[in-house]
Each structure stands twice: as C-alpha cells, then as structure tokens.
From Swiss-Prot:
It is found in: Cytoplasm. The gene is nadA. It comes from Chlorobaculum tepidum (strain ATCC 49652 / DSM 12025 / NBRC 103806 / TLS) (Chlorobium tepidum). Gene3D superfamilies: NadA-like. This is Quinolinate synthase. SUPFAM superfamilies: NadA-like. It catalyses: iminosuccinate + dihydroxyacetone phosphate = quinolinate + phosphate + 2 H2O + H(+). Keywords: 4Fe-4S, Cytoplasm, Iron, Iron-sulfur, Metal-binding, Pyridine nucleotide biosynthesis, Transferase.
Length: 322
C-alpha cells in the first residue's frame, strides 16, 4: 500500500470537524488562503477564508499576501488565480472539476468567430479558458457584465460569450445589440417558465429571484435578477421572508447563514431535465481539500505566454469594474 493510499484512507476516516481543524492548521503552516465559490459544499465554505462569486474571488486572488492560494471551485477559477499570481503556488482539490460552459467555447472556433467579425471587440465571461481570455479584449462576470458593456461606445460592435443567456440579459438591460456565442450553463438553462409559474402559485408569499444565466422566459417571471453576490445582498436586505431561488442551490447555505429567519426554496426543475446541481463544484470535497494541502498538489500551472495574454483582458475587467 502506498503512502498516498494510506493518506486517502486516513482522510476518509476523519470526521468533518477533525478535517476542518487539520485544514486550519495547515493553512497557518503554509501561509495559505482558501478561496471558495458559493456553489461549493457547505463544509468547503466553512473551511474557506473567503467565499464569493467569480469577481470577488478574482479580486481576492489579486490582492492576497498569502504564499499559497487553495482554490475550491472549478478549473477556470483556479486558472484565473494563477494568471493573476504567477509567483504563488495555486492548489486545487480536484482539477478535474471543469466547467461545461467554458468547454463549450473551443479556442479555434472562437478565433474563427473573431476573425469573421474583425471590427468587433470581444467581451468574454470569466467562465472561459485562459486561451479564450487571451483571445478576448475584456473579461466580465455576471456581477459587472452590464456595467462593462455600458462603458463601450455605442457604435462599437461587441462579441459576447460564451453564455448566451447572460448575453441576452445584458442586451435587454443595455439596449445593445451584441453577437452572442451560443453556450450556456447546464444548471441554469434547465429552469423553465412553466415550473417558475407553478412555484409562485405554490408559494404565493415567496419572491422569485434568479441568476442571469437563466433563460429569458425564467427571468421575466423573477422580481429580481442578479449575480450570486447580488442575490445574497438582495435577500439579506429585503423585508420579504421567503424566496424561490433560481440558481445553483449551493448558495442557500450562505443565504441561510446571513438571514437565519428567512426561508429559501430551491426553484423547481423540469423532471425531464433535472440537472439542478453543479456536479463539478461538488467535486471539491473536504478530504480532497485537506489532501491537496498536505501534498501541495495538484498545483495549477499556466504557460507564461498564455498567462500574459490572458492577464490583459482580466486586468481590463478589474480596471473597468473598480
């Protein structure tokens, strides 16, 4: 039996509390910071120093003084942290946790799309690979996409990708006509209008709120649309006591933590398309987090020429959303 196998068996036999204690001890020993997305498991969020959306986590990665960044999210997030911090070690509990939305935009196809529209600038959702970021002019998140698009001169043609639903929402909000890449998040795209109407009838006192990665038919049923951080702020400040939440249900942990007296109902899915959970986010388990810190592996690396190209579009986002 190998040492690695022994360590995996040991980690599997530890309680959540014991693993959390070990993770905290390792964090101090390594001078590490743990960043986690709102869609990760509750115990991962408990272990994290900062839990946030893509923009908040990118800013945290840019500003940290830690020597090691441990990123519990999906691959493009850890990759973005490495792009911003080439001199730091960036670890990820499970590099196999990819993002199907990011994967829906292959480098060569996106390059051809750009070449077909040479006068357009490309504003690209952060849910994309480093190669796509290098091919882009400005990166955005769901928190700042509208704000960034509003800063572009009205005569300038815009390519927006890879999420068609977020792009359509930004078009509606800004009145801009953009060329949309036809990607989507499988979790958010699975919501349908008929089930939102049924949920509102079933819970008449609850307010429907939704993430802009949902389809337009769902968004028109919502009384508030926003990024994960915006949804959290809204529910925390709202006088309403119950909410139907149309986004990945991992966010309910933070909502309940911030507003313990309120009720949060996961929006229902079509039984014929019941993909309500981001299984990639859930690949970040507490034992994997512990083991990646013990082993200082898997480590995320980015080729320097790729990193430099991608950094320009990320920096442009951070400047435009400051």
């Amino acid at each position: 039996m190998t040492i690695a196998t022994d360590m995996h068996k040991e980690a599997a036999g530890l309680s959540t509390e014991a693993l959390l204690r070990r993770v905290q001890a390792l964090k101090k020993e390594m001078n590490a910071i743990i960043l986690a997305h709102y869609y990760t498991l509750p115990e991962i969020q408990q272990a994290a120093d900062i839990v946030g959306d893509s923009l908040a986590l990118a800013r945290a990665a840019e500003k940290t003084s830690a020597d090691v960044i441990v990123f519990a999210g999906v691959y493009f997030m850890a990759e973005t942290a490495k792009i911003l911090n080439p001199g730091k070690m960036v670890l990820m509990p499970d590099p196999g946790a990819g993002c199907p939305l990011a994967d829906s935009c292959p480098e060569e196809e996106f390059r051809a799309f750009r070449q077909a529209h040479p006068d357009a600038i490309a504003i690209t959702y952060v849910n994309s690979s480093a190669a796509i970021k290098k091919l882009s002019d400005i990166i955005c998140t769901s928190s700042n996409a509208e704000h960034i698009v509003r800063q572009i001169p009205p005569e300038q043609q815009i390519i927006f990708g890879p999420d068609r639903n977020l792009g359509a929402w930004v078009m509606k909000r800004t009145g801009r006509d953009m060329l949309l890449w036809q990607g989507f998040c499988y979790v958010h795209d699975a919501y349908s209008e008929v089930y939102m109407i049924q949920a509102k009838a079933m819970y008449p006192d609850a307010e429907l709120i939704a993430h802009p990665e949902c389809r337009e038919e769902v968004l028109r049923q919502a009384s508030f649309v926003g990024s994960t951080s915006a949804l959290l702020d809204y529910t925390e400040k709202s006088p309403r006591k119950s909410f139907i939440v149309a986004t990945e249900p991992g966010i309910l942990y933070e909502m309940e933590k911030r507003s313990p007296g309120k009720v949060f109902i996961p929006a229902p899915k079509d039984p014929a398309n019941p993909r309500s959970v981001c299984k990639q986010m859930k690949q970040n388990t507490l034992d994997k987090l512990y083991l990646c810190m013990v082993n200082r592996s898997p480590e995320i690396t980015v080729d320097e020429s790729l990193r430099e190209g991608a950094l320009k579009s990320i920096k442009r986002m951070l400047e435009m959303s400051a």
